[in-house]
């Protein structure tokens, strides 16, 4: 009789589900009000003009327009703003 001994168990073999963070709309892209621009943990990017921030630090468009990324301020912070077509 062919026998194969049972394989041992392991305590490894699991990982957390990816959270799909990152920039969703890049510089120059057109957005509509309510579109998510960046999903992030903490404020890696800060909200500029016409951009709102959610309780999980998600940045979203408050008006229609084009996305603009800029670095400004004494601490070289990254800001995301929306340039409206007026």
UniProtKB/Swiss-Prot annotation:
Q: Which GO terms describe its biological process?
A: translation
Naming one, the record's GO cellular component terms include:
cytosolic large ribosomal subunit
Keyword terms of this UniProt record: Ribonucleoprotein, Ribosomal protein
Family annotation (SUPFAM superfamilies) = Ribosomal L27 protein-like (SSF110324)
Q: Which GO terms describe its molecular function?
A: structural constituent of ribosome
Q: Where is this region: Disordered?
A: 1-22
Return the PROSITE patterns for the record. RIBOSOMAL_L27
InterPro entries of this UniProt entry? Ribosomal_bL27, Ribosomal_bL27_CS
Q: Could you confirm whether the keyword Ribosomal protein appears in this record?
A: yes
Read off the Gene3D superfamilies from this record: 2.40.50.100
Q: Which NCBIfam families match?
A: L27
* Family under the similarity heading: Belongs to the bacterial ribosomal protein bL27 family.
- Listed name of the protein: Large ribosomal subunit protein bL27
- The species this protein belongs to is Vibrio cholerae serotype O1 (strain ATCC 39315 / El Tor Inaba N16961)
Q: Which gene encodes it?
A: rpmA
């Amino acid at each position: 009789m062919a026998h194969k001994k049972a394989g041992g168990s392991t305590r490894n073999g699991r990982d957390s589900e990816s959270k799909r963070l990152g920039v969703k709309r890049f510089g120059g892209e057109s957005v509509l009000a309510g579109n998510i621009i960046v999903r992030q943990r903490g404020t890696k990017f800060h909200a500029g003009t016409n951009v709102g921030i959610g309780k999980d630090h998600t940045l979203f468009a408050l008006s229609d327009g084009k996305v603009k990324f800029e670095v400004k301020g004494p601490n070289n912070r990254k800001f995301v703003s929306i340039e409206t077509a007026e």
